From Swiss-Prot:
SUPFAM superfamilies: PRTase-like (SSF53271). This is Uracil phosphoribosyltransferase. Allosterically activated by GTP. Its cofactor is Mg(2+). One of its GO terms (molecular function) is GTP binding. Keywords: Allosteric enzyme, Glycosyltransferase, GTP-binding, Magnesium, Nucleotide-binding, Transferase. It catalyses: UMP + diphosphate = 5-phospho-alpha-D-ribose 1-diphosphate + uracil. 5-phospho-alpha-D-ribose 1-diphosphate binds at residues 78, 103, 130-138, 199. InterPro entries: PRibTrfase_dom, PRTase-like, Upp_B, UPRTase/APRTase, Ura_phspho_trans. Pathway: Pyrimidine metabolism; UMP biosynthesis via salvage pathway; UMP from uracil: step 1/1. The lineage of its organism: Bacteria, Pseudomonadati, Pseudomonadota, Gammaproteobacteria, Pseudomonadales. One of its GO terms (biological process) is uracil salvage. Pfam families: UPRTase (PF14681).
Amino acid sequence: MPIREIRHPLIRHKLGLMRRADISTKNFRELAQEVGSILTYEATSDLPLEHYNIDGWCGPVQVEKISGKKITVVPILRAGIGMLDGVLSLIPGAKVSAVGIARNEETFKAQTYLEKLVPEIEQRLAIIIDPMLATGGSMVATIDMLKKAGCKEIRALVLVAAPEGIAAVEAAHPDVLILTASIDERLDEHGYIVPGLGDAGDKIFGTKQKDI
């Protein structure tokens, strides 16, 4: 299933702001949520609908509601938390499954340290969120985990993706749709996306930002 790069003008503008070296923690957090919300809008555009009747102000009226599978949002900790509020602003009824995966900075391999999936996840559409798709190790490990739990329909939302990470996910899980705000140039020798956003987790949580 091909990757989709969402080139909406609002996304292009907000992503440009996020790439600034001098961006504040507050602004980066807010923009991550906003772009996450727009990606969610795109990722749910094909959800099935069903009709039902309600009492309107002038009498009975037929309206629509989302039908089919319920949704679980799966942030990859810790950086995925930075997109969560933006996603839930559009699908507030979704349940949250948390996955903790850290990257070994020497081998770039993914190491799982937390798995908290909602009950009956096999009956849900899983939407994975993570700001960066770099080597693809964390994303592949998360998809492996979800499929092992019985989840059959999975989508992923990332702010920025590297070609290397896209290739890794497509090779391991060609059935998973990835939506991104930008397909960037490459990975550097340290496994960071170029031009990328820097360390999204550090920027979201203010790890290295100076106190004001």
